[in-house]
């Protein structure tokens, strides 16, 4: 008789934990699954929860059904957030794939977002290297390497100097 009540309390604890995680920020479905399956930190150190795969599936399904968990919304917010921090489309795509988002969902969200990647790349280069962007070859290579590291595409980087009067 104690078995059903302990299962229910396990489900309730897992659901409570999921809601607390999602209250902080949006997560992808894969991120939420990973965090729910991970041990909980307590005063005595990491404490493993007795979570069954069925309970985990029920909690994730409940979160999706009640719109606490939405990968499409997460992708849009993630793209906006990372682009505001100065990252380019290649890096954002790579980070989203690490978070378990399907490639077609990422590509659709990238098409839907209204971001001018060339002007963002120019802003990042000007912030790092100053107002007239360098025109010497060695300095251009440094700027290019920096922007590639930040995740901008080569054609966006080349567009900066194409429209730049020396």
From Swiss-Prot:
Annotated GO CC locations: cytoplasm
Location of this chain's protein in the cell: Cytoplasm
Keyword Cytoplasm annotated: yes
Keywords: Cytoplasm
Parts forming coiled coils: none
InterPro entries: RecX_HTH_1st, RecX_HTH_2nd, RecX_HTH_3rd, Regulatory_RecX, WH-like_DNA-bd_sf
Family under the similarity heading: Belongs to the RecX family.
Role according to the record: Modulates RecA activity.
This protein's name: Regulatory protein RecX
Species name: Klebsiella pneumoniae (strain 342)
Gene: recX
């Amino acid at each position: 008789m104690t078995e059903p009540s302990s299962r229910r309390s396990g489900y309730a604890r897992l659901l409570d934990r999921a809601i607390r995680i999602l209250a902080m920020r949006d997560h992808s479905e894969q991120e939420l699954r990973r965090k729910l399956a991970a041990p909980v930190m307590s005063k005595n150190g990491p404490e493993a929860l007795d979570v069954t795969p069925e309970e985990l599936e029920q909690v994730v399904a409940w979160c999706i059904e009640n719109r606490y968990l939405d990968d499409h919304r997460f992708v849009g917010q993630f793209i906006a957030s990372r682009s505001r921090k100065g990252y380019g489309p290649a890096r954002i795509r790579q980070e989203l794939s690490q978070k378990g988002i399907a490639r077609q969902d990422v590509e659709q969200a990238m098409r839907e977002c209204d971001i001018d990647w060339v002007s963002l790349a120019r802003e990042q280069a000007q912030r790092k290297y100053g107002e007239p962007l360098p025109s010497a070859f060695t300095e251009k290579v440094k700027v290019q390497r920096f922007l590639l590291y930040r995740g901008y595409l080569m054609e966006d980087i080349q567009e900066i100097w194409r429209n730049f009067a020396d």
